[in-house]
Amino acid sequence: MVSNPVHGLPFLPGTSFKDSTKTAFHRSQTLSYRNGYAIVRRPTVGIGGDRLQFNQLSQAELDELASKAPVLTYGQPKQAPPADFIPAHVAFDKKVLKFDAYFQEDVPMSTEEQYRIRQVNIYYYLEDDSMSVIEPVVENSGILQGKLIKRQRLAKNDRGDHYHWKDLNRGINITIYGKTFRVVDCDQFTQVFLESQGIELNPPEKMALDPYTELRKQPLRKYVTPSDFDQLKQFLTFDKQVLRFYAIWDDTDSMYGECRTYIIHYYLMDDTVEIREVHERNDGRDPFPLLMNRQRVPKVLVENAKNFPQCVLEISDQEVLEWYTAKDFIVGKSLTILGRTFFIYDCDPFTRRYYKEKFGITDLPRIDVSKREPPPVKQELPPYNGFGLVEDSAQNCFALIPKAPKKDVIKMLVNDNKVLRYLAVLESPIPEDKDRRFVFSYFLATDMISIFEPPVRNSGIIGGKYLGRTKVVKPYSTVDNPVYYGPSDFFIGAVIEVFGHRFIILDTDEYVLKYMESNAAQYSPEALASIQNHVRKREAPAPEAESKQTEKDPGVQELEALIDTIQKQLKDHSCKDNIREAFQIYDKEASGYVDRDMFFKICESLNVPVDDSLVKELIRMCSHGEGKINYYNFVRAFSN
């Protein structure tokens, strides 16, 4: 820095001051080049930057320099060489015109908006006259954005012309692939380029805004009219006061629907509703207590909310015109809550008192909603096909896997081996059938009947089993309700019709009479009297009839005498008393006949003296054809 002495003071330390404005202390530059020639200039400033007055040009020199033309000194200037040729793709490389535009898109099937404004950027590439349309990506817009039209040359009309940068301007409409774009503005480079090419640009326009987007950007306005209703007072007054209603939801009209019971709680403190489901034990449902959580329930929605799918609707005060209140819950009234209809059939005593004090409603009777069980459907059996018994055929319809009909085990145990035998004749117009005799065996254990025809020599009719064990249906019964013959239907003179054949009962044995007398309640007095009279007549025959019978059948008298002799001779023999029951066990058809081999096996097991000469004679007289023996007369010789 320069120290300048103050005038009038000695040049001593402390009397000089530094000038802070002077910082350059080099010598002035006098040598330089001008138009390629080295020249020397006189210095104009000294050391420290002080201007030198003696090296300045005079006014005359300045005027001479101002009036003297350079041509007089340097001559005519040379013409500049022509510029080199530059191709368009090199000259306009990476030079792009940008225009701001928008297009309008229709929005069908929407209650919120009818059209949508979509803003785009149109890029024009000068190097190859191609264009592209790009829509700026907006977050959470819900539509596909980005590159709408890729870079390409775009057709302007149907004649094959393409868009050129001369066709683009602000404030015009351009149609690209059937979609009209409105150009509103461009960037600074585009404006300078078009103006340099002599194109007059239209004034810029304001970018159109999407009405729905702007609506969503606005804050939610709530115009609430001041009300004199005090919610705090309601909360404090009705705290812990709940109305309880009993309701049902009847969904039986739909497939697999049912009627389910619910409890509706209405909280008076804040007008909220809660629905609980009533579960029963083993009802097959998850024991989740709540069907609907505690909340306010809308009663009347706005018009748009009715058409809009309620499954995605967030209910607020803006979508609801009226909410459910306590006066809407009345016994005997149906309510639709969130799409489900509930019928209120009862309430608790507190709710009845509240409605009486608040609304003056006293008639709230309980409604009986219990449904009576429908009568059981009577199973209709298919027609009887004629095979087997009706019970056997019907058993195939009761289960997928057929089972045998259930039997009365007690009856079978009580009446085991109890057989009632009757002698009958066939009622037939054929003369040969009048002399045929049949033995009816009625099995009390199973109510079945078997018929056996004793074989008669030289009769021309094969005897033996006539009908196996089966139940015989009465002629006046139907297939759907069959009535079978029972013990009370068999008496002297009774007509038994067996599958179209009529038989007349002629005789019976003493066991039948004993059974009828012990079970007189099952028989009519006439039937019991007929059996008793018949047995009485049979035990006291007339002398003339006996003499005639002896003359007619001498073999019977001989058989009776032989039986009496055997009874006297074997009086003290140790044979068993149940010999008759032993033969009946092996006589499955209750015909009174057993095979010869089986006969001797039974006699051997019961210690019967078959080797005795009288017993051999009795066996010979009781023998019949086909190797069978009539054990009825044989057993008489061993009975007491």
From Swiss-Prot:
Residues 538-554 have a biased composition (Basic and acidic residues). Changing residue 182 to H: No effect on cell death; binds to CACNA1E. Changing residue 353 to W: In EJM1; no effect on protein expression; no effect on the spindle pole localization; defective mitotic spindle organization; defective cytokinesis. Residues 1-45 are annotated as: Required for its localization in the mitotic spindle and interaction with alpha-tubulin. Residues 535-554 are annotated as: Disordered. It is linked to Juvenile myoclonic epilepsy 1: A subtype of idiopathic generalized epilepsy. Patients have afebrile seizures only, with onset in adolescence (rather than in childhood) and myoclonic jerks which usually occur after awakening and are triggered by sleep deprivation and fatigue. This is EF-hand domain-containing protein 1.
